[in-house]
Amino acid sequence: MTRQIRVGDVLIGGGAPVVIQSMLNTKTTDVEGSLAQIKALKTAGCQIARLAVPNMEAARGFAEICRESPLPLVADIHFDYKLAIAAAESGASKIRINPGNIGGEDRVKAVVDVCKDKHIPIRVGVNGGSLDKRLLEKYGHPTAEALVESAFEHLELLEKYGFYDACLSMKSSTVPTMVQACRLFRSQCDYPLHIGVTETGPVKQGLIKSAMGIGALLLEGIGDTIRVSLTDDPVEEVYAAKDILKAAGLRKEGVNIISCPTCGRTRIDLIGLVNQVDEALKNCEKPITVAVMGCVVNGPGEAREADIGIAGGDGWGMIFEKGEQIEKLPYDELLPALLQRIEKL
């Protein structure tokens, strides 16, 4: 079991459920816009939100946002240690830094002292795209071993000043590298791990890479908090994270939708119907399985374990529960009737 840290009112590691995070894409100086996005993230199921703090103007905006945020906030800091101190003093619930890029040890100690005093954990964020030149020369390129060595160097720097309230991330845009790095680190250390694939590309590729990388580790019991990085609305990152956790058997809340791939027997717009069901139920937290099947020949039987579902006919369909037919309706009435029954479950 990993160590446990507390980010605001959220526990990470130590046997706590895997925590979902995302990062805002608003300007931190846009207080109103940032708060609106944080509220949308919370509605979607996000538990911790991270914001970029690139300068003192952003640090002032971060302070205002902290005062009204419904979620614990992480300040993402690079290069300037004074920004980390300002964020810690402004109400940050966690600081994300790379100790190697904020200056000499005296500056690292200054950040550590403030975080220790205010009981604010630090995430050491190691990234394949920003490894120290010395490690790149040693390993030739950003290997898993290079990421892990960098992580331990940074951890040792925090520990030198008596700071142990930390978590680690070792991210790469290459899935096997990220997975191997996290496995290697976990075999040697019990600090909690923040896992994710970075710079994943277009949304479709990003979803696949994230599901493979994060999912592989979760199935091995590795990973205490996750962020799905997508070139998209951050809210979509949260929905993807929830789906990954559900697929890995680590999340019971929320609807599990199963549907057939369609074939020549399909006589309804199954693809459109599945998308409508998915959209309508995306914020439903009921732990149920909903089936949307293309035909009545195999639909109810194949989806016998579903709590409720639809099987399509030729311009009509039927609603079934646990494989048993409940109601036969015209196609246009299927979705409203299904949602009404789900509401009563």
Task: List each model region and its residues.
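N-terminal amphipathic alpha-helix/helix-capping segment at the start of soluble metabolic enzymes
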Residues: M1-M23, K116, E279
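Active-site mouth loops of central-metabolism enzymes
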Residues: G15-G33, A52-P54, L71-F79, L135-V148, ...
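Catalytic alpha/beta core domains of metabolic enzymes, predominantly
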Residues: N127, L135-K282
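Hydrophobic or amphipathic alpha-helical targeting/insertion segments
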Residues: K82-R123
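Alpha-helix-loop-beta-strand connector modules within alpha/beta enzyme cores
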Residues: M56-I77, A110-I122, C182-L193, V277-E279
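Hydrophobic faces of well-ordered beta-strands that scaffold small-molecule active sites
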Residues: V18-L24, A49-L51, L73-I77, I95-I97, ...
